[in-house]
Amino acid sequence: MHEMSITQSVVEICEVHAAGRKVTEVVLLIGELSGVVPESVEFCFEACSKGTLLEGARLQLELVLGVGSCPACHGEFPISTLFEPCPGCGAFGLSVVAGEELRVKELELE
């Protein structure tokens, strides 16, 4: 489960930005195409934050839906995998416009 190491990194990043202040809430963006399972991050958060400035903090996850762009017809549309054909023209080789995110959006501090 790579979500454990990802969650540990999120906690470390938050501690750096908290600059010694207690964190009460973390808002994390997770893209649908990022390969990260949101439920696993939620499960790992309590264990990873124990004994840190984030202990007891609320974790709010915001899912970013996948959006692709077609190189042939330049259309943009929702995607749920990286290997879908364009629904407009059937071309492959889509570029991801959104959905690969994994980042801390907000920290609430005491």
From Swiss-Prot:
PROSITE patterns: HYPA. GO terms for molecular function: nickel cation binding; zinc ion binding. Pfam families: HypA. The keyword Metal-binding applies. Keywords: Metal-binding, Nickel, Zinc. Transmembrane segments: none annotated. GO terms for biological process: protein maturation; protein modification process. InterPro entries: Hydgase_Ni_incorp_HypA/HybF_CS, HypA/HybF. Zn(2+) binds at residues 70, 73, 86, 89. Ni(2+) binds at residue 2. The keyword Cell membrane does not apply. Involved in the maturation of [NiFe] hydrogenases. Required for nickel insertion into the metal center of the hydrogenase. Belongs to the HypA/HybF family. This is Hydrogenase maturation factor HypA. It comes from Geobacter sp. (strain M21).
